[in-house]
Amino acid sequence: MTKAFRIRAVRVHTLNPAARAGTYFMPGAAEHWLVDSLIANPMSGYARYRERRSSWGIGVLGSLVVEIETEDGTVGVATGSGGMPAAWIVRHHFARFLIGQDARNINLIWDQMYRASLPYGRKGVTIMAISAVDLALWDLVGKVRGEPVYNLIGGRSRDEITFYCTTPEPAAIKALGFWGAKVPLPHGPFDGEAGLRANLDFLAAHRAAVGPDFPLMVDCYMSLTVSYAIRLAEAARPLNIHWWEEVLSPEDDDGYRAIKAAHPTLTWTTAEHEYTRYGFRQLIADRLIDILQPDVMWVGGLTETLRIAAHAAAYDTPVVPHGSGPYSYHFIASQTGPAFCEYVAASADGKTIQPVFGDLFVGEPMPVNGRMTLPATPGFGMELRDRAMLVEVA
């Protein structure tokens, strides 16, 4: 092992609250559509928390940044979700599996972190912590080798990536050149028949605004029941919905089986809130879902996303990650399946796009006219912009 790969330091940070940066960063505003507009969600059954997702603490944990440095001074960096809880796990538990280790031994490090955290982990914040470490390792190895991450995981399979955009304003996004738009469903079962009619009116208005052929997807954010999803999808057939996303709780594989049986010709997607390959086994083996959407920053990092994709490929099930910015772009660039990614309209009104991570990095690529050609910059191609944004975890 050379000095270039031997890990000598692990630094973990949360973000200064004043920083205009973070995982899935949303600029400071009196209101932001992602958290302060009416979006059906698992807490919609409680009147106190129905109107705004910010009311029940979505995103309250915040972000973390992991830096891994080798003996020659090369630093790999990545951001992720989980804030202070995830940062504490990395600093006080996972660092022992990194110091002195060869940074190329990514599978070994991943396995040790996962097995050591089984008594309290397996999903959620713990896997988010593993994801951040994993992504920092890939960035580090790419920088040492002088190659982009996509070259380390199979090379470039396509020159260009296209994007759809998640937004409350599909017509504005269509004008920006994105090939499709995904809208958040406003109402769920707790809003009754009036809510069902309002959902159909909402979708019909957006269909009219973008025309009959522009792909329009619907994000249901774990908010529906089996019977409601079946009814809604049937009633919306004339609107030509491109896919229905995350209609049920991640725990309800049997529910997805029932929905797919009821509407086998419609496209159903899910799994941004599923964790590790173990959470995907039944979805894949039973062919319950048409497109799998792991979040690279939540599911276990790039390493675990590649494992899930390999498993899914045996069943001809496409994998198109949820969000994840450049971490998803490098994955998609290396794959031979779908050549598109998700982008989220992070402006307060959702009509324009901004960097996924705000001002956190220099070098974060953005789509132009809904398209992107990834540069060949080493690692993920990004460097921290300003260390004043960081608060190191002791």
Kindly give the residue locations of the regions a language model identified:
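Short loop/turn motifs at secondary-structure junctions and domain boundaries
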Residues: 56-60
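Hydrophobic faces of well-ordered beta-strands that scaffold small-molecule active sites
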Residues: 78, 159-166, 181-183, 216-220, ...
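Conserved, mostly hydrophobic/aromatic
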Residues: 7, 73, 94, 133, ...
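Shared catalytic-loop signature of beta/alpha-barrel
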Residues: 46-47, 240, 251-371, 375
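Flexible C-terminal active-site loop/helix
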Residues: 2-22, 26-51, 322-394
